[in-house]
Design a protein with these regions (language model features):
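Extended serine/threonine-enriched, polar tracts that run as long, contiguous segments within proteins
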Residues: 92, 106, 248, 257-261
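Conserved small/polar residues in nucleotide/adenosyl-binding loops
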Residues: 380-387
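Intrinsically disordered, low-complexity Pro/Gly/Ser/Thr-rich segments with frequent PxxP/GP/PP motifs
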Residues: 1, 117-156, 262-295
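Eukaryote-biased detector of low-complexity, proline/serine/threonine-rich segments
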Residues: 1-26, 144-185, 287-321
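Short beta-strand elements
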Residues: 29-52, 195-213, 325-343
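Low-complexity, acidic Ser/Thr/Pro/Gly-rich terminal tails and inter-domain linkers that flank the onset
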Residues: 51-72, 210-227, 337-358
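Short beta-strand elements of extracellular/lumenal beta-sandwich folds
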Residues: 77-89, 232-243, 360-371
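A short beta-turn/strand-edge loop motif at beta-sheet boundaries
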Residues: 91-99, 246-252, 374-379
Length: 387
């Protein structure tokens, strides 16, 4: 098995050719020569005639990246049930890979620096390999990466910056291509039995589809409800829709963004944010301060009047408690629209002029019908002007 693995990896295996016997062309032995042959020892370096590179490519269809409550800020869990690798071997016999353990180091091709290593655990695999000739077997291995921790290549400020930049590039690019270096430990079924191929090396380009700054598709505010407040803020529940255009399911914990209407007028927090691939409907909590400035009051008046208001949702330094995500999250800028209130607060109003109105005083009788679409708002009094 070791010789087979080293052969595939284009490594030299020191072997010794040992003389055993001599047979002449007529089939008879030559005892006088055999004794000399038996003591013959020849060192023979055993190596493939050229590099094989058995793993030709890795395709990531779907990936999961999760920061749990106790995760290392630079060591999230990675997993996938949709990985595949194209394999080609210079052997003409059937092979079926039944499980793999993969260690993958993601490398930035621009500076050739390692970014992070995925220390894979043993995971099942399925194989579609075909013997295409007497000296060629090729096909696809479908891999599963069970939850495995990522780790930095070294504990240094430079290594942490590389990982931060990797996540920032993923956040803002359409496709993030990197070099995937590593080794695979494969348990394979062959005509001669089950064989463990230990340490099959590979180096291929692969990548992830990026988040594109979450601006590829509109971020929608689907509904707003007042659920409480203080002297400083009105507390809102916000129903929102965010589209994830990448091929990565993300779990990034509590996330807070600023609500900007020319000035900062509040904040929006998405607890335990998970962005799955495609469209996500999320519940957020917002603290809105209408007294932040004239813009805050204008925004409130527009909302109550049924007018849409264009806002910007912006990241900042404290958008996340996860240190490695701070550079990416603080640069997020997402445009959205707060739809105006669809329900008219004043449903109807009537004025009755009394016999004394305008004679003894200016008092008239009014009746107003109000609607309250908010969960935690109670009307205590109404002040109005009639013209």
């Amino acid at each position: 098995r070791q010789i087979f693995t080293q052969y595939i990896n284009y490594e030299i295996t020191p072997t010794v050719a040992v003389g055993r016997n001599v047979t002449l062309p007529d089939g008879n032995g030559a005892s006088w020569l055999a004794e000399g042959i038996k003591v013959l020892r020849i060192n023979v370096p055993f190596q493939a005639p050229e590099p094989i590179h058995p793993i030709k490519s890795i395709l990531i269809k779907r990936f999961n990246l999760t920061y749990g409550p106790h995760s290392n800020a630079y060591g999230p869990d990675a997993s996938s049930d949709a990985l595949s690798a194209e394999l080609a071997l210079p052997f003409g016999f059937p092979l079926r890979v039944i499980s793999t353990t993969n260690e993958i180091t993601i490398v930035d091709e621009k500076n050739n620096k390692p970014i992070t290593t995925v220390n894979g655990v043993k995971s099942p695999a399925e194989t579609e390999l075909n013997v295409v000739s007497t000296d060629q077997t090729e096909g696809t291995i479908y891999l599963t990466l069970n939850p495995s921790s990522m780790s930095l290549p070294e504990q240094s400020d430079e290594a942490r910056r590389e990982f931060e930049m990797f996540q920032k590039e993923f956040t803002f690019t359409k496709e993030d291509i990197k070099l995937f270096n590593g080794s695979s430990r494969s348990l394979s079924e062959t005509p001669v039995g089950t064989v463990l191929l230990n340490g099959i090396k590979f180096s291929v380009e692969s990548g992830l589809l990026g988040l594109q700054g979450l601006n590829q598709y509109p971020t929608l505010i689907l509904g707003v409800d007042v659920v409480g407040g203080t002297r400083a803020n009105i507390n809102l529940n916000v129903n929102t829709s965010i589209y994830n255009p990448s091929n990565v399911n993300l779990g990034v914990g509590d996330t807070t963004l600023l609500m900007v209407y020319e000035i900062v007028v509040g904040s929006v927090t998405i607890p335990n944010m998970r962005l799955n691939i495609g469209n996500n409907t999320l519940q957020a909590m917002s603290k809105f301060n209408p007294n932040a400035g004239p813009q805050g009051l204008d925004m409130l008046n527009r909302y109550i009047s049924g007018l849409d208001t264009h806002l910007n949702i912006s990241g900042y330094e404290d958008s996340t408690h996860i240190a490695s995500l701070k550079p990416a999250f603080s640069a997020v800028r997402v445009n959205t629209t707060l739809p105006g209130l669809k329900t008219k607060l004043v449903q109807s109003a009537s004025l009755k002029v009394l016999e004394s109105t305008g004679i003894t005083d200016d008092v008239a009788q009014t009746q107003v019908s109000l609607d309250n679409p908010f969960t935690s708002v109670s009307y205590t009094h109404l002040r109005a002007h009639e013209t």
